[in-house]
Regions:
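Alpha/beta-hydrolase active-site loop
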Residues: 193, 220-242
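Short beta-strand element of the alpha/beta-hydrolase
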Residues: 147-150, 159-171, 180
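Conserved alpha/beta-hydrolase "acid-adjacent" motif
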Residues: 412-419
Length: 478
């Protein structure tokens, strides 16, 4: 057994033993006194196993509305809390120093530094890969360094249309970013093979843009931050001078976690990057989760599902880590609420890449991660506000660019086919060119496979300027 696998096996065994001890010693119900009690604690209602839209909205209406636009700031971001920071060294190329350049007058998408990616040639033979660090903004409007990799096929033409691939990461470790993957021979556990499906676009002469949508702090599933990275990477492509792409158009697509990023970018783009509207041919959102209030329930944070082990708890743990990294100054007492088991899970997850991050948190009972009283606390209410702010379902706008939503009706992780259907109806009423592709009996893992031909055809058409035909009367059945 290799050293990394041996190390991960020990971690998983440790978590299992810790969980057993926690259950036996009753840490999950340890009192936390009346410390941090919210003035108006959230009423979570009594959500069903397949939480309805109305039950999610009941919780959402107790929280602040999601702002349509953010006020962009110039100063540095609030410091990240040390206990959620990875203890692995990050690539210096990712240094979060954008605020210094903003004070010099740099705008969104303006390049801070760049480098050639040598190892990308192993994945995409014959192509040139350039990695850029550029100015973007986080989910609260603070300047942030974003990174992306632009792969140029040898036969690319001037102003060729570009495929933006938004990779599913599901991780918290600094070695998980696509830019890092493509710049080293061993990315410590991340699955590299999915990014190679982009080779088809390269063969046809279309550049491919890989985004690092978790930002420099590896903040998993903070979707407004991810949206800014995606949109500012398009701006960056128009500004770079390594190859003439100033008038290039984009097709932006993602699956699962990549779908979360893409879906939020689609809905926020008219207000964050309105000048890009003529340049975006298509957003493709496959198996995204637009409603994080429901997702927290589906993954076992609260309600009846919190009483059974969740095989997907690792996703929720990664989100908790990402939320604390992004909003640490707003949830300063989160560490206080964690049990010893919870602290062990967080400490482990902050370094891991998929699939290890999923395995390490899987099968756990999330109620054992926090002390009794947590769900009445200001900290929990703030975390649910963060979840709402990361939900494209609760964003008050609609896309301007054509948007394709794809979801399986029996998705066993997200349970959000109804949410996508509701978004489709909402976007149609707003005048968006929208299609909802429904996959009967499709699961989270089979839906992308079954819908792959549809995605490929629409991608190729859109890259050649042929936009999708809107369908607002009935869902398309695949």
């Amino acid at each position: 057994m290799s050293q990394p696998r041996r190390r991960v096996s020990k971690i998983i065994l440790s978590l299992s033993l810790t969980a057993t001890m926690v259950a036996g010693l009753g840490y999950g119900v340890a009192g936390a006194s009346n410390f941090d009690v919210a003035d108006k604690p959230l009423d979570l209602g009594n959500p069903e196993v397949g939480m309805t839209i109305e039950q999610s909205q009941f919780i959402a209406h107790q929280l602040r509305p999601v702002p349509l636009k953010l006020k962009l700031k110039k100063g540095p971001r609030p410091a990240m809390l040390k206990w959620v920071a990875s203890d692995l060294d990050d690539d210096p190329f990712m240094k979060d120093d954008a605020w210094r350049y903003v004070r010099k007058g740099y705008k969104q998408g303006q390049i801070i530094r760049k480098r050639e990616s040598i190892w990308s040639k192993a994945y995409f033979p014959g192509s040139r890969a350039i990695q850029y660090a550029f100015v973007s903004y986080d989910s609260r409007g603070y300047p942030m360094t974003a990174t992306a990799t632009l792969v140029l096929p040898p036969h690319a033409k001037e102003n060729a249309n570009i495929l933006q691939w938004n990779q599913f990461i599901n991780s918290s470790g600094p070695k998980c970013k696509v830019t890092t993957q493509l710049n080293q021979p061993d990315s410590w556990g991340i699955v590299n093979s999915p990014i190679q499906i982009m080779s088809a676009a390269l063969i046809l002469g279309h550049p491919v843009l890989f985004t690092d949508a978790e930002g420099p702090r590896n903040s998993y599933a903070i979707n407004r931050l991810a949206s800014h990275v995606l949109l500012d990477s398009m701006r960056m492509v128009h500004k770079q001078k390594d190859f003439p792409l100033r008038q290039s158009h984009f097709v932006s697509m993602g699956i699962s976690h990549g779908g979360l990023q893409t879906g939020y970018a689609a809905v926020e783009q008219p207000h964050y990057a309105p000048e890009l509207t003529p340049y975006i041919e298509q957003f493709i959102v496959n198996e995204g989760a637009p409603d994080f209030i429901k997702l927290a329930h589906s993954l076992g944070l609260y309600g009846d599902l919190s009483k059974v082990p969740s095989p997907w708890a690792g996703f929720l743990v990664s989100f908790i880590v990402g939320a604390i990294r992004e909003y640490g100054d707003m949830v300063p007492h989160m560490e206080h609420w964690l049990t010893p088991y919870g602290k062990t899970v967080v400490k482990t997850s902050r370094n891991l890449c998929m699939p290890f991050s999923t395995v390490a948190g899987g099968g756990g009972l999330l109620k054992y991660m926090v002390k009794d009283g947590f769900f009445k606390s200001t900290t929990f209410k703030t975390m649910m506000q963060i979840a709402k702010d990361s939900s494209s379902f609760y964003y008050p706008g609609a896309p301007k660019a054509p948007t394709l939503l794809i979801h399986g009706t029996t998705d066993e992780i997200l349970f959000q086919a109804d949410q996508d259907k509701a978004l489709w109806q909402r976007y149609c009423k707003a005048g968006t060119n929208t299609v909802y592709q429904q996959v009967p009996l499709g699961t989270h893992f089979t839906t992308p496979v079954v819908s792959l031909p549809r995605m490929v055809v629409q991608t190729l058409l859109s890259l050649n300027g042929v936009r999708q035909i809107p369908s607002c009367k009935i869902p398309m059945i695949l």
